[in-house]
């Protein structure tokens, strides 16, 4: 018997019969591991990639009620990847993407980072985006719920900032394949704040993220959630697909369960990770550019200038000269407790974004 290969499945590229040589320009820039992952998990085949895209494009004529404002190959490809190359499902998602924008025109007026409402939300850390990806290549987004100052930011503007951020991030083909993780820290999120999460705005968020955006969400993780966040499930359940209810995890203050799914080396110290505390202004500086400055020293690490430029080419390089400080009501490093497995087990799936 020959030696047993110990390579991960995504590194066994020699089993692909030379398909890497057939890679189209639409796969250019992807790592070999990601190309293999797309083949195994998403059914992506470079031999028929252009045909798959064209078949989705040919379906557009069936929805004359929708204005499909973008139909180029690279754009349609992200919808195919989000639906594992099921063409009918990919087209349905594409149609819902533009229909959502038609039905919510006010949300997408001046849809750029220097819009006053979006800018305020970004500066306040909605969303946070970690620089490094996790062990599966997924981008990690953070929401510190208690930082929601309702006199400063409307929920709609926070949602707009999240959607704009996803638009920028999804330009990266690696993230189209590997996807995203969302962690929501509910520490000190008050009942009064929660009372503003009405069914109508929750429905708006679910429709925008679950039903109308071409992103693969590998999990949504709740940390330090109070009892009334559990109660929100009864509000959002009617709006959720059955398959999406499996990917949100309620960790409470149990870091062990979180770390079983996301390794500590990829997490900031607020979540028991080995990274420094998260700087709330990091992602705002990335989108708003080098003119976002403050009196304190910081290292400005741009995400990927090409992707930001593609989506936000008309951004003005301006921002108020202040550094967002984490709300005192938000959990600080070391607040969350490590618990033995089996104690206060609180990680039952609740909901997820597909």
Swiss-Prot record:
Cellular location(s): Golgi apparatus, trans-Golgi network membrane; Cytoplasmic vesicle, Clathrin-coated vesicle; Early endosome membrane
Residue ranges constituting the CRAL-TRIO domain according to the UniProt record: 118-279
Top-rank lineage group of the source organism: Eukaryota
Stretches with biased composition (Polar residues): 345-354
Nucleotide-binding keyword on record: no
GO molecular function: phosphatidylinositol bisphosphate binding; phosphatidylinositol-3,5-bisphosphate binding
Expression by tissue: Expressed mainly in the brain.
Gene Ontology biological process terms, A to Z: lysosome organization
Protein keywords: Cytoplasmic vesicle, Endosome, Golgi apparatus, Lipid-binding, Membrane
Domain notes: The CRAL-TRIO domain is required for targeting to the membrane and for binding PtdIns(3,5)P2.
Summary of subunit composition and partner proteins: Forms a complex with clathrin heavy chain and gamma-adaptin.
Protein name: Clavesin-1
Naturally occurring in which organism (per UniProt): Homo sapiens
Record lineage: Eukaryota, Metazoa, Chordata, Craniata, Vertebrata
Gene: CLVS1
């Amino acid at each position: 018997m020959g030696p047993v290969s110990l390579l991960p499945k995504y590194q066994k590229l020699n089993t692909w019969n030379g398909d890497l040589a057939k890679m189209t320009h639409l796969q250019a820039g992807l790592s070999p591991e990601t190309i293999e992952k797309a083949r195994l998990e998403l059914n992506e085949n470079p031999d028929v990639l252009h045909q798959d895209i064209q078949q989705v494009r040919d379906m557009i004529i069936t929805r004359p009620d929708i204005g499909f404002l973008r139909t180029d190959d690279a754009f349609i490809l992200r919808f195919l990847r989000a639906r594992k190359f099921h063409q009918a499902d990919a087209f349905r998602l594409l149609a819902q993407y533009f229909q959502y924008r038609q039905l919510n025109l006010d949300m997408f007026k001046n849809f750029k980072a220097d819009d006053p409402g979006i800018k305020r939300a970004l500066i306040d850390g909605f969303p946070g985006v970690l620089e490094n990806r996790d062990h599966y290549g997924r981008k990690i987004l953070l929401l510190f719920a208690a930082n929601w100052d309702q006199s400063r930011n409307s929920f709609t503007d926070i949602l707009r900032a999240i959607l704009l951020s996803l638009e920028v991030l999804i330009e990266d083909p690696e993230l189209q394949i590997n996807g995203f993780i969302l962690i929501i820290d509910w520490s000190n999120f008050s009942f009064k704040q929660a009372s503003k999460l009405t069914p109508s705005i929750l429905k708006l968020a679910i429709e925008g993220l679950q039903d109308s955006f071409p992103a693969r969400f590998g999990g949504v993780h709740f940390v330090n959630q109070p009892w009334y966040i559990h109660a929100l499930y009864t509000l959002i359940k009617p709006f959720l697909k059955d398959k999406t209810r499996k990917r949100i995890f309620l960790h409470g203050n149990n870091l062990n369960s979180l770390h079983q799914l996301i390794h500590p080396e990829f997490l900031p110290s607020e979540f028991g990770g080995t990274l420094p505390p998260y700087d709330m202004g990091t992602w705002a500086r990335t989108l708003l550019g080098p003119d976002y400055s403050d009196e304190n020293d910081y290292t400005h690490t741009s995400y990927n200038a090409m992707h930001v430029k593609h989506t936000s080419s008309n951004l003005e390089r301006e921002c108020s000269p202040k550094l967002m400080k984490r709300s005192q009501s938000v959990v600080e490093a070391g607040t969350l407790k490590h618990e033995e497995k089996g104690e206060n087990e609180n990680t039952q799936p609740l909901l997820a974004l597909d």
